[in-house]
């Protein structure tokens, strides 16, 4: 059932996937559902809802990624990082979170599903100093764009971008982008079976 739904959703967003990638995405939902019962990793309890609200909500960003090295800040159980890593095996993803149970889950997913292009790091973002900066800084965890830019300003490479995943856009928030940053692009995203608004903001350092 989930496999057929995933097939339809991927076709709807025009994202090609191999049989192995589809299996990894479905198995990720299965592991998230299983671990969630014990570790409370997400408030979404139903696998079909997870497929929409976690997998597809992450994958609609995939075709907009530019570069090779990405960091997913406040990734939780690996969202959007793990689905994006599955669909972009040529890119590297660092998954950053401060809670050990989330990092343990991510590492188990990586091991069981054979995802070799992610590395999970347990750290607060302000304490994390990467040896190499990133082409893209992703997050759907921050309440405000201002918070994301304030906490993550040290992470992008010289020509790197911030990818802020937001729901409905707040005009006031857009007007209070911190100095030194500029919104390069606002992209409206359409997630299959989801009525709520979704936006991707690409932000650069000036």
Swiss-Prot record:
The protein's matches in Pfam families, at most eight in alphabetical order, are given as: GidB
EC number of the protein = 2.1.1.170
Q: Which SUPFAM superfamilies match?
A: S-adenosyl-L-methionine-dependent methyltransferases
Which reaction is recorded as catalysed by this protein? guanosine(527) in 16S rRNA + S-adenosyl-L-methionine = N(7)-methylguanosine(527) in 16S rRNA + S-adenosyl-L-homocysteine
Kindly list the GO CC terms recorded for this protein: cytosol
InterPro entries tied to this protein = rRNA_ssu_MeTfrase_G, SAM-dependent_MTases_sf
Source superkingdom: Bacteria
Q: Which UniProt keywords apply?
A: Cytoplasm, Methyltransferase, rRNA processing, S-adenosyl-L-methionine, Transferase
Where does this polypeptide localize?
Cytoplasm
The molecular function terms of the Gene Ontology recorded here are: rRNA (guanine-N7-)-methyltransferase activity
Sites where the protein binds S-adenosyl-L-methionine:
74, 79, 125-126, 140
Coiled coil start-end: none
Q: Which family does it belong to?
A: Belongs to the methyltransferase superfamily. RNA methyltransferase RsmG family.
What does this protein's UniProt record list under function? Answer: Specifically methylates the N7 position of guanine in position 527 of 16S rRNA.
Entry protein name: Ribosomal RNA small subunit methyltransferase G
The organism named in the record is Shewanella baltica (strain OS155 / ATCC BAA-1091)
- Source taxonomy lineage? Bacteria, Pseudomonadati, Pseudomonadota, Gammaproteobacteria, Alteromonadales
